[in-house]
Each structure stands twice: as C-alpha cells, then as structure tokens.
C-alpha cells in the first residue's frame, strides 16, 4: 500500500473491496461534489467492478487511486487519482479530486502537493494535464495561482497543463 504523508492528511492506496466501493460512491454523490464530477452509477456493485478493472490498470502502472485520510482520526475525507498517462509526452492527468465537509483546513493544498510529489518525483513525469469544469471557479482559481496554464476549452471544461 502506497502512503504519502502531509501535515494533516495522508494518501492511502484504494483497495478493491466493498467498503472502498461504498465510500467512493458516498464521496462522489455529495451534493457539492457530484456537481463537478463525471456522472457515475450509484451502485456499490458497479463501483466494485470499476475498482476491479482499475486494479489491472494499476498493476500496469497506468493509474493510481488514493483515499485522502485525516492523520488525527484516520477518517477517509476524499479521493485523488492519477490516470490518462501519456508516456509519449511524459505527462499524467490527475483528478477525481474530492474532499468532503470533514476535510482539514489545509487538505486541498496538502493533497494537491502530495499527488504532484508522487507523480513528479516518484513516477518521474515531467508534465501534468487535467481538466476542470468551467463552473468550478474555486478550483480554476486555485490552479491558476499554482501556475497551471489553460491550453484549451470546450463547452464544459477548461484544459490545463503544468510543465
């Protein structure tokens, strides 16, 4: 199990089990969270099947999925994922970034730093690409402040890149 520790949170690899599937469905279906995520089925069985397929992608080094947990309570407060790895341009996408209302004050910044540290320094990627829903103004502002550049957009999303 991969773990990366910050000041108030840590990242722990998602496991393929019913409890993980249940927690992901719960996190993805919060009123605020689901507004900015791709729609998924609310079924634990469907999520468990998706996690089984994810495990194969993870074994191939094509995807990494983490729970974000509080250090003080070990409570799962979110998720973050690396996927859409483009080896030809040495880039990874990160997303499925969810934090619930029980997050720590610094959980967003810490999880952002930890996922990038993992991808840039552990996996040795040189670039990052990702998309953000246009109506998710807080996250857009966050990424602009951290140096991400908008490279494209469509009706729904802005596409960002770090180089």
Give the ranges of each region predicted by the language model:
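A short, well-structured alpha-helix characteristic of acyl/acetyltransferase catalytic modules
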Residues: 1-48
């Amino acid at each position: 199990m991969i773990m990366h520790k910050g000041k108030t949170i840590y990242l722990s690899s998602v496991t393929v089990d019913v409890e993980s599937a249940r927690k992901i469905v719960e996190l993805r279906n919060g009123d605020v969270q689901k507004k900015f995520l791709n729609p998924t089925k609310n079924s634990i069985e469907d999520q468990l099947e998706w996690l089984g397929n994810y495990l194969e992608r993870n074994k191939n080094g094509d995807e990494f999925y983490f729970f974000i947990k509080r250090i003080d309570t070990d409570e799962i407060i979110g998720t973050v994922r690396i996927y859409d790895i483009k080896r030809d341009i040495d880039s990874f996408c990160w997303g499925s970034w969810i934090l619930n209302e029980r997050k720590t004050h610094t959980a967003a910044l810490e999880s952002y730093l930890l996922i990038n540290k993992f991808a840039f320094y552990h996996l040795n990627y040189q670039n990052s690409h990702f998309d953000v829903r246009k109506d998710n103004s807080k996250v857009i502002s966050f990424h602009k402040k951290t140096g991400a550049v908008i490279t494209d957009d469509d009706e729904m999303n802005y596409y960002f890149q770090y180089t």
